[in-house]
Amino acid sequence: KSQTLQISLPTNEKVDQTEQNKVKQSEAITIIVDSEREEAVDGVPGKVKKNYVYYYEGKPGGELGIVDENGDGVLDNANNNLKEIEFLGNANGQAQGIRAVLRERNKQVVEKIDLLKADWRAKKLTDEQYQAQAKEIRNDSTLKRPTVIIKATAQASYETLVSALDEMQINSISKYQIDNMNAADSALLKDYLIAHPRK
């Protein structure tokens, strides 16, 4: 029997333009997707060799921020809060990789959605009732829920970006956005790769 995926769009909460890109730091998770590619030929990006996903919580560099006064790419205060992780999905009924991080940060919402899903599977709710109640839960501002900012490097593949968006749906994340890499993100990634070279 074929199945369809119900897509839940991000919430339409009222946010004025100046606050749109400023997220409460305690709620923020930034995901950076990147890919290692073969050499470009005639301006065409090379084939993807491997995809990478990184994340940090709060602001770049944590509370102290980032400092690279001499511009060598190594952060002076050694406060790089960027972590490498993978898109792993579930194993033995447990979330793995970035899914586990997002699930833990959105725990209150996920627990309520899981209970609702159990009622729906037991035929206690119609599809319409389930979708309406799930939307209410995802948008309930009294629940602790993260704001996820997804950023892609110039080398990132569409596959990694789509995987990041899939994780928003899987983990019932209602507040997320795709944004551009900025200087702080690039500095964190460069510093991380100096300390942890790719093999």
Which sequence ranges carry the predicted segments?
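Long, low-hydrophobicity, acidic/polar, solvent-exposed interaction domains
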Residues: S2-K199
